[in-house]
Structure formats: C-alpha cells, structure tokens
Amino acid sequence: MEDKNKTIKETLQGAADAGKRKKLIIKKKGDENSAPSSASPKKETIAESAPVKPLTPLPSRGDSGQSPIVRPAPSASKEVKYEESSRKQDSGQSGSRPLRDKDSQVRPSGDSSYPVSRSPFQKEDSNIIVSRPTQRPVRPNPGGSYQGNRGPGQGGGYQGNRGPGQGGGYQGNRGPGQGGGYQGNRGPGQQTGPGNRFGGSGPGNRSGGPGGRPMPITSAEVELSQARGSTGASKKKGHDKEKTSSDKRDFSGAENTKFFKQRFKKTKVVGVSGVSVPKEITVLENVQVGELAKKMNLKPGDVIGKLMKMGMMVTINNIIDAETAALLADEYGCKVKVVSLYEETIIEEEKDNEGDYINRPPVVTIMGHVDHGKTKLLDTIRRSSVIDTESGGITQHIGAYQVKTARGLITFLDTPGHEAFTSMRARGAKVTDIVILVVAADDGVMPQTLEAISHAKAAEVPIIVAINKIDLPTANPDKIMQELANHGLQSEEWGGQTMYVKISARENIGIDKLLEVILLQAEVMDLKANPKRRAKGTIIEAKLDPGRGSVATVLIQNGTLRVGDPFVAGVFSGRVRAMYNDLGQLIEEAGPAFPAQVTGIDGVPDAGAPFDAMADEKEARNISQHRIEFEKIGNAGAAAGTTSKVTLENMNEYIKLGALKELKVIIKADVRGSAEAIKESLEKLSTPEVKLNVIQSGAGAIVDMDVMLASASNALIIGFHVRANPKTIALAEKEQVQIKYYNIIYQVVDEIKLAMEGLLEPEKIEEVIGTAEIREIFKVSKIGNIAGCMVTSGKIQKSANVRVISDGVTKFDGKLKSLKRVKDDVNDVVSGFECGIQVDGYNDFKVGDTIEAYNVTVIKRKLE
C-alpha cells in the first residue's frame, strides 16, 4: 500500500515539475485580449475546443479486490508545448475533433506502444494536443466562485451539478466527448457554438467558417430550404462573412411563415367589397368611369389612377369609350364584352294574332287660332256626353278624355293648341288620328291657323274644318272656305277632299254632326288595335302630385293596361298602383284609345314619351337604367342609324339610305312678300327624283315653334333678313335643326339648287372605241385562256372597259387584265393588227366571239 501511494505521489510530483518547466496557461473564451489582473488569482480552465473525459476517482482496496489502474504521466524527457495558437490553428483550419484519452496515452518511458492518434482532418505540421493528466487534484475546500459549491469531481453554478464525466447547467447533460444545453448534442470533432446549424458560418458547425464543416442534411431541412427558395448548398471557406438579409432568415424557423402569408394576402387585388375582379364584364359603347369601377368591383380612385397612367385626365363622371375600358380591364385580367346601348333601350315588339284585332275609337286633336273657340268647343262636347249627377260632373283635367256618342266612342286630346301637338311629334309620338281645325266665321284665316295647317300636313293627318261662330250676324262661311282652299283645303262641296262642318260651340249648334263626321272619317281610316296584348301607348302629360307622387296621363294605343302591370315610361320604370279615368273614378284596366291616369312611376316622364307594359319588373328596371345611361351619354337622338336631322350637307346620305324622299323647308322672312317669292322660286326646283316641300312660310323672326316644327318634320329653316334669338338657337342645337341665313333671294335659290343637283344621279355616256374578233384560243397553265384576236375596227386600249359578245348576246362585261402584241405588253392595238387579250375574271372564250372596248363618260346633271 505504501508503495502504491508512493507511486501516486511520484506521478503527481512529476507532473508538477513538468508544469514548472513549461507552464500551461489556457484563457477563457472571450478573455484573449484582456490583460491579467494582479488582484485576482489566475485560474486554469478547460479549453472548449479540446474537451477531455474526466477520470473517475481511484477506488480503495476495500472497494474492490482488484488493483487500481495507474496511468503514468507523460515523460519528462519529451517536452510538450501547449499553446493557444495551436488550438486556434487546429480549430480554425483542420476542423479536428477533440482527442480522447485512449488516443493520447503515452508510456512513461516514451515508447510508442500507445501511439498518439491524429485527427483525420489535421495537418501534418500541427502540434499534437495530448490529454491532460488522468486525475484532477482534489481541492481541500470545494465550491466557490461562479461555478458554485461543488464536491470532489462535481461542478455547480451555471454549469449545474455534474456527475462523473457529465456537464450540467446551460450545457446540459453530455456523454463522453459531447456538449449539451443550448449548444445541443455534438458528436466527435464538432465545435461549440449556438447549436448545430447546417449551412451556417462562425462558431459552431457552419460550413465556410473557421473550424466548420457541413452537417448531414435532414429531410425537414431540405423541405424548408425549398420552401424558402434556398439551394441549401454550403459555401466555400472564407466567402460567407458578408451575408444578405434574405440569407440570414433562410433558416430562421417556420414561425415567420404565418406572418409572410398575411403580408401576401394584404397585397392581393380585391374590389371594394372584398370581391375579386370578375373575369368578364359587359359595357356599352361609352361608359362612365364610376360605372366601370362598379362593374369591376374596384375603387373609383384605382380606375382613375390607371387611366391617368394611360395619359387620360378623367374624373369619376367622365365618359370613356369601350376600347379604353377594354385596355384598362385587361390590366386586371378582365375581359370586356361591348353591347350596343341603343339596342339595349329597345323593347322587342310583341307578336300579334291578326284575329285578335278589333276596331278602336279615333283620337282627335283640336287646333286653331287663339280666339276662335277651341276651348269652348271642347267644353261643349264634353258636357254633352257627361251626366251632371255622375261624380259631380267634370271635376278634373287630365289632358285627354273620351265621349260617348250614338255611334261609338271618341277620344279627344285636350292640349294647348298645336304647340303640344308638335312637341309630341318631335319626340317621335304619333298619337293623333284626326285634326279638327277651328276657324271663326267672322274673323277668317289667321297666322296661327296657317301654322296649324302646316303642322297637320307635316304629320300627314286628315283635317276636318269646323267653321265656328256661325250664329253671329257677321259670319261669312263662304269666305272662310275660299281662303282655306287657297291653302290646299278644298271643300267636298267644291270638288275637294276636305270635310267642312258649320257649328256654334256657344249655342251647341252642329256639335252632333261634327261627331258623326269624325266617326265617318274613322271608318274610312279603318283604325284597329289588339286588346289581348300588353299595353303600348304615349304619355300625354305628367306631373308630381303631393299626395300620390308621380302621376301621368297615358293614352293606350294598343293592348290593355291593368293594375299591377310593370311598365317603362320614357326613361323611368314602375308598376301600376292605381288607375283613374277622366272623371276621377278608379278603374281596373284601360283598353285601346283609352286615356287613363296612372300612379306608381319612379319619376316624371316627358310628354310624348313612349309607354310600354312589361312582363317582368326586373326587365323594366334594366331598360330604364339603359335609357338613363343613353340619355347621359347624349345619344338620345340616335335611332336606326340616323343620329341627326337633315341638312343641306347630308341630304345626299339621307337619299341613299332611303330615309329622305323630299326636302322639307320652313321659310321665315322680314315681310310676307319676300317669303312668298322665295317659296315660289324653291317649289320650281322640285323634280320627280327629289321633291322640295315648303311646309311653312311666313313673316317674322325665327321662334321656338319654328324649330319644333322643323324637328318634328325633319326640315331645315331658311331665314331671309331675320334671325333667331339666343334661346331659339340653343333649342335648335339641342334638336339638331339647321338654320340658314340669307340676304339675297337668288343666293337662297342657288344654294338649294346646288344641294339638290348633288342628289341627282349623274348621266353616263358610253362610247365604243374598238372591236376585235377572236380567231384562236391559247391555254396557258397557271394563267388561263388567252384570246388571239384581230382588231377589226378602232383600237383596243388596255385601260378601257370590255364586253364579250357571242351571237349578239353579251356574255361578260369587265376590264382587261393584259394586252400583248406578240410577247410584249402594250397599251393599245389599232385596227389591222393581231393581239393577245386576257380578260379579268373570264376564260370561256370561243372562236368567232367579239370583244368590244368602250369608255364611259360621267356628266353631272343640272336642274333646269
């Protein structure tokens, strides 16, 4: 026992002597640059780069029957250098693993029975680090310092209590040659650092840095690398110190995935309501910016911004064309389907069964001069057909009413003269079947009488003349008949076609006869309608009633309107809530030629607007919306390919389209004599091909009624020494009516004459310049047949028209394709010479046929 203890003491003493000769100083990591302090004692710590397996305490004899194992200290004769530089070089370049005790055993004698093992990655010139002494000296007072109290062979404090050969605390439990804790478990030859990271650099196992080498790549890391867009490949040594921000977060963990997904969702293009842009939208030829944004589920500001980038400065109310809308929608991956706005406003006509037609009452309008008794005549006719006890007599005015006679019903329009009549006609409404022209027997024909005649003739409506006030002593009916005959209204008594009735509205004379004449004229006209179809009519007048809302008087022209029917009135839609007749009584339905007051309209329509009952309320709203858009765009005058009224410049186009059969003119002059002279001069220009019709002439300034008449009749206005005021000019621009001003009569005639001459078909004169006889036919592949000809008269020109004549019958009429003399192309061949002729579009030549060349001269025609 004493010998063995002596041996241990000698071993420890030998190690102490060796340390005196070359003292080993190992500094803590991070204290390499710090100066040693004299106040605190120097401490020897274990180098992190070379962990050594601690030796177990020597057992006593009583613990085991075996002899204790004694490991001799290194030989004192061989000096071993322990330098920090060797550790750095080995750690930074070779990447070697820590040496274990069994790899560094050396006999005391220094022989090589226990060779020192090298790291497979160690360079040949590196210093070999051997293991430390097999036994740590036991401190007499264990514990203290930052490591805490510890017993023999144990560490405390931040490292925790460790059993033999184990490390605790933040490093965790480690097996032999392993590191634990936040650094993770490491195999042999691994460097310490913040855990094992593959593909990194610096401390720990990161490739490309000091002391690093690639770690095995797991499947989870490969998937994460692919998701991040990283290759996961290791970089070369010394080239990864400068890293981008994207490289630093390549493998920062999957906890950021949710954050990036949220960021991505916020950048998705969505609409105002969170709905994505549709794949296809339908727009009209012109669309408002705000409406386009609504259709695409986008904010108006986004659409305006896109248009500004396209070079268009617009606002939400501006209108763009369909092509621009398509380009903008394409930026969002949306297709645009363009539809015609005008077609969307048209209501399809319902098919009628001819067997359902029945006779309908006539619709009559009363016209005439202001003081000739129009209103009195209307009141007399109405009171004669209304019983006083029936709803208190006449209680309201609705603009139209029906009267009962012994022979049938008659509908009268109670409108303020021909002004309303013309206004409705200007909007395209044709509601009147017969016009009653009232003329006072004691006054004669007045200017308003002539205007009423012009309006009635322009509407192509038959006229019945009612000579009123025959009860007065100064009445002269024959004088009235003579004056009206001079204006084209010749009485049947005098061999004409106009019916005259002598009445007295105040004395109720001749009223029944007037009603009979009206019904007789209606029978001649054979007026019919179909009551079994949906209602179709015209708005006579409309107003806003404080108690009932929008109220409109509708004249049903075809079909039957019932309570509850959806409808479209002009640009507004609605559903019939209630209907009233001219007596104010509630009714359930209204048939053809029946005037009714209708409630339930979304707005107040214009007089003369069309009224159509619909099968579906949704369809009615859609048509109403399209008509409102159509009106906003400014195409309200467009209809069936014609978007403007006739002018002197576009008359030729109207003639070709068949939309104009005659030129209608309104003449206004400073004096009546000038107006009559211009009228007579222009009427002489009328021809069977182009007719000129002066629908009205008179003295005075051009007023609004002249413009409305021209608009309704599609006529132009000629002003001679007179002009229109600014208000009338604005109305003419709105109605697209042309006004021409002149100061000399022959200027009027010459300009109208030139315009009408342009409408005449030019005269064509044909001149035969030569003939050729076909004597032989040559067939050439890929070219066709060539006619070998002899010019028999005149000359054949290449630029001339030709016709092929066979047995006196023209087989073909066209142009020459080529003309050759021998093999040369020539422009003409005269009589007596042979030539080769190829006709464009014709190959069926026969020997003996004749080719005739001719020219056509166009001569412009003039009015005589």
From Swiss-Prot:
Function: One of the essential components for the initiation of protein synthesis. Protects formylmethionyl-tRNA from spontaneous hydrolysis and promotes its binding to the 30S ribosomal subunits. Also involved in the hydrolysis of GTP during the formation of the 70S ribosomal complex.
InterPro entries attached to this UniProt entry: EF-G-like_DII (IPR053905), EFTu-like_2 (IPR004161), IF2_II (IPR044145), IF2_N (IPR006847), P-loop_NTPase (IPR027417), Small_GTP-bd (IPR005225), T_Tr_GTP-bd_dom (IPR000795), TF_IF2_bacterial-like (IPR000178)
Residue numbers spanned by region Disordered: 1-252
Protein name (Swiss-Prot/TrEMBL): Translation initiation factor IF-2
Domain tr-type G: 359-528
Coiled coil: none
GO molecular function: GTP binding; GTPase activity; translation initiation factor activity
Localization (cell): Cytoplasm
Main localization (coarse): cytoplasm
Basic and acidic residues: bias regions: 78-90, 239-252
PANTHER family associated with the record: TR-TYPE G DOMAIN-CONTAINING PROTEIN, TRANSLATION INITIATION FACTOR IF-2-RELATED
